[in-house]
C-alpha cells in the first residue's frame, strides 16, 4: 500500500539544476560533501530519508553522519563505499578473499619499486589513482601510456600530488 502521508522533496546540490528544481519543494545550493552541513540541513528541513548519488559525499562520510541522527539513507556508509572510491581497498579485498578476477597489482605511494614492477608486467598494465578522480585518474598502457617512461612520469605526478596509486 502507498503511504497517505504528504511527500516533500528537498535537494541539496552543488549548483542550480532547473530540471531537478522543478520537481523539488526546495533546492539548496551548498557543500553536500560536508557531513556537518548536510546533517544541519536535514534537521532544519525535517528530512527522514536521503538518497545520495555522487561518490564524494559517500567517501566523506555523509551517509554515516545522517544514519547517526536517525535519517535513513539510500547509499552505502563510508567503509562500504570504499569498494568504489579506493582501488587499493578493492584489490586488497579481492586478494584477501581469493575472489577471481583480481589482476596482479601493487599499491604505491612513492616511486620505490615502480620501474621494477612495470618491467615485470611488460606492456599490459593500468595505472590508477587510488581515490576519487572523476574518471580522470586511470591511464591504460597502449591507450594513454605508450612506454614505461610515460608510465613512470605519470606515477611521479601522482606521488608529487601526495597520492597513492595502483598498478
Residues covered by each model-derived region:
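ATP-binding N-terminal substructure of ATP-dependent carboxylate-amine bond-forming enzymes
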Residues: 1-78
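Glycine-/Pro-rich loop/turn segments that contact NAD(P) or position catalytic residues
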Residues: 67-71, 78-124, 135-144
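Short secondary-structure boundary segments
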Residues: 54, 129-130
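Conserved ATP-binding module of the ATP-grasp superfamily
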Residues: 100-103, 124-127, 141-167
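Glycine-rich phosphate-binding loop signature in dinucleotide/nucleotide-binding domains
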Residues: 42-47, 120-121, 160-161
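Glycine-rich beta-alpha junction loops
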Residues: 15-16, 112, 131-133
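A general structural signal for well-ordered alpha-helical segments in protein cores
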Residues: 35-38, 59-63, 87-91, 114, ...
Amino acid at each position: 500500500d502507498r503511504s497517505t502521508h504528504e511527500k516533500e522533496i528537498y535537494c541539496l546540490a552543488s549548483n542550480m539544476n532547473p530540471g531537478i528544481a522543478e520537481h523539488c519543494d526546495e533546492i539548496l545550493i551548498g557543500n553536500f560533501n560536508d557531513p556537518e552541513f548536510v546533517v544541519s540541513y536535514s534537521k532544519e528541513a525535517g528530512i527522514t530519508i536521503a538518497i545520495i548519488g555522487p561518490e564524494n559525499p559517500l567517501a566523506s562520510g555523509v551517509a554515516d553522519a545522517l544514519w547517526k541522527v536517525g535519517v535513513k539513507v539510500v547509499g552505502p556508509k563510508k567503509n562500504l563505499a570504499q569498494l568504489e572510491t579506493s582501488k587499493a581497498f578493492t584489490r586488497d579485498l579481492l586478494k584477501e578473499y581469493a575472489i577471481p578476477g583480481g589482476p596482479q597489482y601493487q599499491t604505491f605511494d612513492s616511486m620505490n619499486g615502480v620501474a621494477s614492477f612495470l618491467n615485470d608486467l611488460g606492456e599490459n598494465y593500468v595505472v590508477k589513482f587510488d581515490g576519487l578522480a572523476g574518471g580522470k585518474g586511470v591511464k591504460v598502457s597502449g591507450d594513454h601510456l605508450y612506454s614505461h617512461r610515460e608510465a613512470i612520469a605519470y606515477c611521479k605526478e601522482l606521488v608529487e600530488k601526495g597520492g597513492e596509486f595502483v598498478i
